C-alpha cells in the first residue's frame, strides 16, 4: 500500500469568515422562526468596526437585523476593543431587497407543473438555482466523517471551549486548527502534524505558557477522546506547531475582513471529497446549494452505514426551476460491496431528491441554521441535524439485494 499525508483544517467561531456565516444564519433563523416560507439569501461582510449585511429576502416576518448582528458578535466573545472588535459599539449597515420575481416563478411553480402539467404536490417546487452538490461519508470515524476534518473540528471547538470556560483565560476568539494524517492506502495510521493558531492577549509568552497550555488543555484531551471513540492511530510522535508566526495578538475582523461563504471546505469534508462550489450560510432550504448538499450527506452516510461501501461520494445536479434532478452520480473508490450501479439504483428508489421532498424529509423549514455555521455542517449528530440520521439503512440494503 502507498503511504500519503492528507491535511484538513478548521477555524473557531471567532474567525472573521465564521462570524459572517453565523450572522447570516442567525438572520435566516429569525425569519424562519416567524415565517417558515421565507426566501432568504443574506450575505455578511465584517471588517474593523463595521458589519454590512446585504442580500435578497421575501418574507412576512420582521427581524431587527442590527440587534441580531450585535447579539451574535457578543455571544462569540468580541465585547471589547481590546479584543479587536466590540459588538456593542460596531456599525451595522443593511442593504436587503426582495427576491427576483424571475427566480421566484421557477421555485414556486416548477417546470414539471408549469410546462408538463404535473399535479404532484412535490413537483410544484423547482430548484432555486442550477448547480451540482456532493455528499460524502467514510467508515474511518464513528460519525462516518474523514478523520482529518473530524479531528480539526474537535480541536477548534475545544479551543473555543477553554477560552469561554476560563481554562485558558488569555485566549481571544479568533483561531485555527490544522491536522495532517498519514494514510496507508485508505486506512488512517498515524497523526503526523497538528497546527493550532490562537489569538491571545498581549504579553503572553509562546514557549513557556501558550504552547504548553494548548498541548495540555486542547490537543491531548482530544487525542485521548480519539481512543475512547475507537479510533486507533499512532499519536505518539506527532509534531505540534502552536502559533508558528510567534505572535497572534491582532485577530478577528481587525486582522482580516470576513465574508459569508468563504470556508466551504471547512464546512464540508475538509477537502477529502469534491465540492460543487455553493456555500450554505444565509440561504433558506429552497436553495439547493444548501438543502441538496445536506441531502447528499444523508444519502452517502446511509450508504456507508448500510455496509454497501466503506467510502461513498454522491453527486446530484439540478436545473433552476425544475424539481427532478438532472443527474445523479455515485463514486465508491473501489470499496463497494455490491455493484455501484446497484447502489445508484437503490438510492434512486429509496430517496426522493426533489427539493420539496428533501425539505419535507429532513424538516428543513425550521430555525436550526445558526448552530450549523461553525465547526462543520456534517458529522455532528445533534438532534436538529436530521441529515445525519441513518434511517434509510434497511431500505437501501433491501433495494440493493442484501
Swiss-Prot record:
Q: Give me the Gene Ontology terms describing cellular component.
A: cytosol
Residues binding ATP are 15, 174-176, 247-248, 256, 262-263, 279, 283
Q: What is its EC number?
A: 2.5.1.6
Does Ion transport count among this protein's keywords? no
Pathway terms, separated by semicolons:
Amino-acid biosynthesis; S-adenosyl-L-methionine biosynthesis; S-adenosyl-L-methionine from L-methionine: step 1/1
Q: Where in the cell is it found?
A: Cytoplasm
Q: Which residues bind K(+)?
A: 43
Coiled-coil intervals, chain numbering: none
Q: Where is this region: Flexible loop?
A: 99-109
Give UniProt keywords alphabetically: ATP-binding, Cytoplasm, Magnesium, Metal-binding, Nucleotide-binding, One-carbon metabolism, Potassium, Transferase
GO MF annotation terms: ATP binding; magnesium ion binding; methionine adenosyltransferase activity
Instruction: Report the co-factor binding details.
Output: Binds 2 divalent ions per subunit. Binds 1 potassium ion per subunit.
Catalytic activity, per the record?
Answer: L-methionine + ATP + H2O = S-adenosyl-L-methionine + phosphate + diphosphate
Family the UniProt entry places it in = Belongs to the AdoMet synthase family.
Query: What PANTHER family does UniProt report for this protein, alphabetically?
Result: S-ADENOSYLMETHIONINE SYNTHETASE (PTHR11964)
Its function, per the record, reads: Catalyzes the formation of S-adenosylmethionine (AdoMet) from methionine and ATP. The overall synthetic reaction is composed of two sequential steps, AdoMet formation and the subsequent tripolyphosphate hydrolysis which occurs prior to release of AdoMet from the enzyme.
What protein am I looking at?
A: S-adenosylmethionine synthase
Source organism per entry reads Streptomyces coelicolor (strain ATCC BAA-471 / A3(2) / M145)
Amino acid at each position: 500500500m502507498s503511504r500519503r499525508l492528507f491535511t484538513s483544517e478548521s477555524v473557531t467561531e471567532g474567525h472573521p469568515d465564521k462570524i459572517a456565516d453565523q450572522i447570516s444564519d442567525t438572520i435566516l433563523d429569525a425569519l424562519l422562526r416567524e415565517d417558515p416560507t421565507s426566501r432568504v439569501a443574506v450575505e455578511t461582510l465584517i471588517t474593523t468596526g463595521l458589519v454590512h449585511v446585504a442580500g435578497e429576502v421575501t418574507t412576512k416576518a420582521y427581524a431587527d437585523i442590527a440587534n441580531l448582528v450585535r447579539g451574535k458578535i457578543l455571544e462569540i466573545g468580541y465585547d471589547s476593543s481590546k479584543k479587536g472588535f466590540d459588538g456593542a459599539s460596531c456599525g451595522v449597515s443593511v442593504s436587503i431587497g426582495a427576491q427576483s420575481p424571475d427566480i421566484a416563478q421557477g421555485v414556486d411553480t416548477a417546470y414539471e407543473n408549469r410546462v408538463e402539467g404535473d399535479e404532484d404536490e412535490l413537483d410544484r417546487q423547482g430548484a432555486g438555482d442550477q448547480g451540482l452538490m456532493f455528499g460524502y461519508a467514510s467508515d474511518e470515524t464513528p460519525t462516518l466523517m474523514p478523520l482529518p476534518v473530524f479531528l480539526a473540528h474537535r480541536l477548534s471547538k475545544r479551543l473555543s471551549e477553554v477560552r469561554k470556560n476560563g481554562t485558558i483565560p488569555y485566549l481571544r476568539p479568533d483561531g485555527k486548527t490544522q491536522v495532517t494524517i498519514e494514510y496507508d492506502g485508505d486506512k488512517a495510521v498515524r497523526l503526523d502534524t497538528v497546527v493550532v493558531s490562537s489569538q491571545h492577549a498581549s504579553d503572553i509568552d509562546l514557549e513557556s505558557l501558550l504552547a504548553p497550555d494548548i498541548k495540555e488543555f486542547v490537543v491531548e484531551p482530544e487525542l485521548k477522546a480519539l481512543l475512547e471513540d475507537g479510533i486507533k492511530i499512532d499519536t505518539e510522535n506527532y509534531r505540534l506547531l502552536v502559533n508558528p508566526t510567534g505572535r497572534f495578538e491582532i485577530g478577528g475582523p481587525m486582522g482580516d475582513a470576513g465574508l459569508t461563504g468563504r470556508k466551504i471546505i471547512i464546512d464540508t469534508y475538509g477537502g477529502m471529497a469534491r465540492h460543487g462550489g455553493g456555500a450554505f450560510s444565509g440561504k433558506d432550504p429552497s436553495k439547493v446549494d444548501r438543502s441538496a448538499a445536506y441531502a447528499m450527506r444523508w444519502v452517502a452516510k446511509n450508504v456507508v452505514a448500510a455496509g454497501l461501501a466503506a467510502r461513498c461520494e454522491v453527486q446530484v445536479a439540478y436545473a433552476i426551476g425544475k424539481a427532478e434532478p438532472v443527474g445523479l452520480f455515485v463514486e465508491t473508490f473501489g470499496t463497494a460491496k455490491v455493484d455501484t450501479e446497484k447502489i445508484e439504483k437503490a438510492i434512486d428508489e429509496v430517496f426522493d431528491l426533489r427539493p420539496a421532498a428533501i425539505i419535507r424529509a429532513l424538516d428543513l423549514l425550521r430555525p436550526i441554521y445558526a448552530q450549523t455555521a461553525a465547526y462543520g455542517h456534517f458529522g455532528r449528530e445533534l438532534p436538529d441535524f436530521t441529515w445525519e440520521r441513518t434511517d434509510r439503512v434497511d431500505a437501501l440494503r433491501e433495494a440493493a439485494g442484501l
